[in-house]
Amino acid sequence: MSRIADTFAELQSKGRKALIPYVTAGFPFVDITPALMHGMVEAGADVIELGVPFSDPMADGPVIQKAGEKALALGVGLAQVLEMVRSFRLRNSTTPVVLMGYANPVERYEQRHGKGAFARDAGEAGVDGVLIVDYPPEECEQFAADLRGHGIDLIFLLAPTSTAERMQQVARVASGYVYYVSLKGVTGSGALDTAAVEAMLPRIREHVKIPVGVGFGIRDAATAQAIGRVADAVVIGSRIIQLIEDQPHEKVVGITVDFLRGVRKALDA
């Protein structure tokens, strides 16, 4: 079993839900990411999603776009993100790390380092899962096999508009968990309709037999608690970015820890 599968199995045995915070790698300071990841774990995170900065992030709302632009300006690319994961792994060998991003940086990395280099290097760095927003499941079988060969799960997004056929395609190649995008549109947008999420999850579970995480639009502990009643995991990203984007270096980790502790407490209530 993968580290992600182990984590979900352990949580399910205790009747708990996974807390999955997201942050753009290298934001808001290029050297802060490993410390921020350790803070997230201390606050109760079960899995960490690290955003790989990209210049044209079509699924990201303005908050995460801006974070990505800042990280890119600081010189953060895929190679630097893998180095951050390596650094995190020096002190943590148990918390799963998922890279979330777009096809272009992966393809550029492979052009530079050779075919299969991404899966190899991500596995060596200690990455557990990869979510590539613009890789369709029907074209991913080889990529999924490459990742599996290095112990890495391939994670997919599902949306309110996803058809049964799409869910079946995802179910064939996905592992670890699937990420249900609870709003139409981009990350961090609009208010979350928890009743609509609750209605959708049984449809997803008809086809997908791995855990389902829900994200996009979860901004506070109360919403996380409501989603945690029906989903296997709660993903929070834009809100964390907003909380830390204008903070001085010495406050970033503490602010994140305080916020996530409140969410963890609500999820466990």
From Swiss-Prot:
Superkingdom in the source lineage: Bacteria
Catalytic activity reads: (1S,2R)-1-C-(indol-3-yl)glycerol 3-phosphate + L-serine = D-glyceraldehyde 3-phosphate + L-tryptophan + H2O
Cellular component annotations (GO), alphabetically ordered? cytosol
Q: Name one Pfam family in it.
A: Trp_syntA
Q: Name one GO molecular function term.
A: tryptophan synthase activity
Q: Hey, which pathway is this one from?
A: Amino-acid biosynthesis; L-tryptophan biosynthesis; L-tryptophan from chorismate: step 5/5
Keywords (alphabetical) are: Amino-acid biosynthesis, Aromatic amino acid biosynthesis, Lyase, Tryptophan biosynthesis
Class of the enzyme per the UniProt entry, highest EC level: lyase
The UniProt entry annotates the active site at: E49, D60
Q: What is its EC number?
A: 4.2.1.20
- Report the HAMAP family cross-referenced here: Trp_synth_alpha (MF_00131)
PANTHER family cross-referenced by the UniProt entry: TRYPTOPHAN SYNTHASE ALPHA CHAIN, CHLOROPLASTIC, TRYPTOPHAN SYNTHASE, ALPHA CHAIN
- Describe the subunit structure: Tetramer of two alpha and two beta chains.
Function description: The alpha subunit is responsible for the aldol cleavage of indoleglycerol phosphate to indole and glyceraldehyde 3-phosphate.
Q: What is this protein called?
A: Tryptophan synthase alpha chain
Give me the gene this protein comes from.
Answer: trpA
